[in-house]
Amino acid sequence: MLDFPNQSRVFDPTRRAVRFWGHDGAMEWSFYVSEDALKLLQPAMTRDEAALLSAFDSSRLAIYAAAKKAYKRSRKGSYELAAADF
């Protein structure tokens, strides 16, 4: 079962996304939630790094739910969550 025990997240300026990690047993999976997805979740958000990280923190439960759905659909090295995933 996918869990998110590590509350760490980091802004990836190349992808314009926030990266976070999920764990299933001993395996770790990378997830990226796009800037556009975060803007959908937090419409008043500005598009700077601090605002993106804050939007992630405020929407953590919805993001984790979308990540679990993506993980359930297929197993791969990393997952990108777009606005359509919410």
Where are these regions (language model features)?
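Short, charged/polar N-terminal "headpieces" of proteins
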Residues: 1-22, 27
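Acidic, low-complexity intrinsically disordered segments
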Residues: 4, 44-86
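A broad, structure-centric signal for solvent-exposed, well-ordered loop/edge residues
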Residues: 8-11, 27, 40, 45-48, ...
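Short linear sequence elements within intrinsically disordered, low-complexity coil regions
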Residues: 9, 16, 25, 36-37, ...
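A short, structured beta-strand/loop element
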Residues: 18-43
